[in-house]
Regions:
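Generic, ordered loop/turn and secondary-structure boundary motif
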Residues: 6, 115-118, 176
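Conserved Radical SAM active-site core
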Residues: 18-143, 148-162
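Radical SAM enzyme [4Fe-4S]-AdoMet core and its adjacent flexible, acidic
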Residues: 163-179
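Short glycine/proline- and charge-enriched loop/turn segments
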Residues: 13-16, 111-112, 178-179
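Long, contiguous hydrophobic alpha-helical segments, chiefly transmembrane helices and signal peptides
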Residues: 1, 14, 105, 144-145, ...
Length: 179
């Protein structure tokens, strides 16, 4: 699903608080997701992920995601990843059982700078989610965004936080403001 996220992350085009021309749609049908996975696999892509806007994927949408992953796990030979916000231990376990091997959840910046970019959830919530990912035995992918008013100390603090959690992959993004 895309757009209309209730979170107030200042950098995000998906946030309902930010006025962008972001495409808005609900959770895609399973057949579309599986078709996209197969296409990516046929083109040599190593990993495929369902990425959703919003604080967390819950209820019927979460169940749809689990079923889509089960189908992709049976029909495709590709690493499966997920990026669905704040999930609990049970949800992460279900995704893992469905074939997901990696979970993406960026911390965005340092603990000190985080309140400057988001007030609808906390840095500690992000760290806790990553700890749950690691406890489940999944590959943790987490990084941040450069160019949101942070200084070099914030960048270093973010790196230290990621090392303390033991993340396996650290994507770094550069903010490109939407006009």
């Amino acid at each position: 699903r895309s757009g209309k996220c209730p979170e107030d992350c200042k950098y995000c085009a998906q946030s309902a608080h930010n006025h962008t021309d972001c495409e808005v749609y609900d959770f895609l049908p399973e057949e579309d997701i599986v078709k996209a996975c197969k296409l990516n696999e046929s083109e040599g892509v190593d990993r495929f992920s369902i990425v959703t806007a919003g604080k967390a994927l819950t209820g019927e949408e979460f169940e749809k995601a689990v079923h889509a992953y089960e189908t992709m796990n049976k029909e495709c030979d590709i690493e499966l990843c997920a990026s669905m916000g704040f999930l609990n231990a049970e949800q992460l376990h279900r995704l893992h059982e469905a074939g997901v091997t990696s979970y993406h959840h960026n911390i965005e910046t340092s603990r000190r700078n985080f309140p400057n970019i988001c007030t609808t959830h906390t840095y500690d919530m992000k760290i806790e989610t990553l700890k749950l990912v690691k406890a489940e035995g999944m590959w943790a992918c987490s990084g941040g965004i450069i160019g949101m008013g942070e200084d070099w100390e914030d960048r270093l603090d973010m790196a230290i936080s990621l090392a303390e959690v033991g993340v396996d992959s650290i994507p770094l993004n550069a903010l490109m403001p939407i006009k």
